[in-house]
Amino acid sequence: MFNSDKVKIGICPIGWTNDDMPDLGKENTFEQAISEMALAGFKGTEIGNKYPKDVKVLKKALEMRNLQIASAWFSSFLTTKPYEETEKEFIAYRDFLHAMGSKVIVVSEQGHSIQGQMETPIFDGKYHFNEEEWNLLANGLNKLGQLAADKGMKIVYHHHMGTGVQTTEEIDKLMSVTDENLVYLLFDTGHLVYSGENPVEILKKYVHRIKHVHLKDIRPEIVSKVKNEKLSFLKGVRAGAFTVPGDGSIDFEPIFKILAENNYEGWLMIEAEQDPSIANPLEYAIKGRQYIKEKASI
């Protein structure tokens, strides 16, 4: 199905320790997390807050476990702060990831985002960009995309619950106002289904701009609870809205099929934030890896 020389399977550290809610997984160390990732059969990871900031130290720890850094999250504030502030932070981030051998940089606009607000209802409190803000976002992302290209890298935009780019319409808008040769898309199954979007249709439409994939499943009964009880994104995570592929309601087979048929190259990353005291990270990592092996033959 997939070309195993071109597609790698990784997992994000958020199942072990949650950067947005540090009490979740506070007992789990960096070394434990990456050791269990390797044990579960993964080849890569993204960067979490507990990871060493020194390139040599991080590389040594990963190389001992045959792991690579696939990417890392970068928060842009192009709609709410001067561009120069975002650019300065981005360049430092880009250079660190480049030194680690990463090819893509995950970017998500956090201007007006409610994803990190503990009390704001995720389905009712979302902000919508005006035209001026869309222009700021598009121009800024194009510039960041060029800065990434200068190092042989790509930026992949992460559509996300509670942000200005969440829905199908907003993803369409983002793709239409940005340069297709500078700004690419991160495809996240869980965030699309959570939002009520059709992931297969979005994948078909933008498969050639998708350069990074987050595989995340949802528990629909928890998402319904979040909606009915007007819970925040973070409270939804605590309640168990997300889980690993194969443990929720999303059918990943057509997604794998479309990616493979279009010769997708890059990382398939499990990213499934939940409470590690309830969902044992190693157990769920193994469960997710086995599901991918069964359904994607990789």
Curated annotation (Swiss-Prot):
Keywords: Cobalt, Lyase, Manganese. Its EC number is 4.2.1.44. Gene3D superfamilies: Divalent-metal-dependent TIM barrel enzymes. It comes from the Bacteria. The keyword Lyase applies. Pathway: Polyol metabolism; myo-inositol degradation into acetyl-CoA; acetyl-CoA from myo-inositol: step 2/7. Its cofactor is glutathione; Co(2+); Mn(2+). It catalyses: scyllo-inosose = 3D-3,5/4-trihydroxycyclohexane-1,2-dione + H2O. GO terms for molecular function: manganese ion binding; myo-inosose-2 dehydratase activity. One of its GO terms (biological process) is inositol catabolic process. Belongs to the IolE/MocC family. This is Inosose dehydratase. It comes from Clostridium botulinum (strain Alaska E43 / Type E3).
